[in-house]
Amino acid sequence: VTETLRALAARYDRRSALTLALLLVTYALVAVMWRRYIDLSQRDVLLVGIWIFMTALMCWDIRPQRDLIRAVVGLGGGLVIEAWGTVTEIWWYFTAERPPIWILPAWPVASIAIDRLARAVDLVLPQGDHRALWWLMLPPFTIGMTWWVWPSVNHPMTMAAVVAMGVVLVWPGATREDVRLMLAGSGLGIFLEYWGTSRHCWTYYTLETPPIAAVFAHGFAAVAFQRVAALCDKAVTAWRSALPQRN
């Protein structure tokens, strides 16, 4: 346990301090831009805890190229997911926007945070590819999520979402990586979804706080984002290799 904690702590460095400063500036800008939605008279311990934890993750083991790619993929994927969910009314926000612009910055932050958390999970996860866990988590989720969104299956965006989940399953990926992303994303999803639904920031059509499908969807989305990010990683590496070498 001590060695694991030391390994985790060793991945904080000078870049962590710079990242923390940039994050604090970003948080301040977001708070100013959407201050009409902020009520400082209420103390939300859970929200503060979530943001402290995610900020700690954002400052850990910084890899600029990897992080930038996952931020862009997370933003794009988040926009598609939010548009799908709000247009089909699988969920809706208290502002009735479809989707609200203010929720979008949370997606790249969550994408990087889950990637960090998954790498931390890798330090404590037993050796092996955990293929059995993969089969116990990803295919059942796909079936369960399809059943959960079935009331809106006639909508083209829901049809596309179901097809996309199938593509993620058959798209070759590292089994161990999928498992740790699913664990990390779903673990963080528990707190994010409970906060959002219990505070009525967003509401699902089932009125659950929160629906189990929504919790595990964070993990599956992380796996899907990684599929796309891995392609981007390869493209950037190939592009750099093709550049003229400096003497």
Q: At which residue positions do the language-model features occur?
A:
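Aromatic-rich, lipid-facing transmembrane alpha helices and their immediate juxtamembrane interface loops
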Residues: 1-247
